[in-house]
Amino acid sequence: MIILKSKEDIAAIKEACEIWKKVKNELMQQVKVGMTTKQVDDLANQLICKYDAIPTFYKLYDFPGYICISINDELIQGIGSDYVLKPNDMSTCDIGITYKNHICDSAFTWILPPNDDSSKQKILKTTYTCLM
């Protein structure tokens, strides 16, 4: 079944995506080496709520986190924990935002400073090139 979206629905979806981008950018600016992944999860929740949005994943199928966060070779859908972020950790965050009953859900990966691990840089560049 195909559900057609109204102009209002499409506008709300665009707003949700704009909020997602703001949360992503602010999260990347504020996450620092020495934070735990649970602190990153809590920060993401604060940022999402700041824009009057809802963290989509929280309590979905009993998921305990606000976002999914995985470090280095962990599989996606990781849960924030007491793991302390280290220099050159590769972090993948999957963020779902519900805004006006519409969802924006996407993941991104970045390398924590000083970002001088050439093997991690290569995998990110190769993956990006394949997707684009």
What are these regions (language model features)?
Residues 1-132:
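Active-site neighborhoods and metal-handling regions in enzymes and metal-associated proteins
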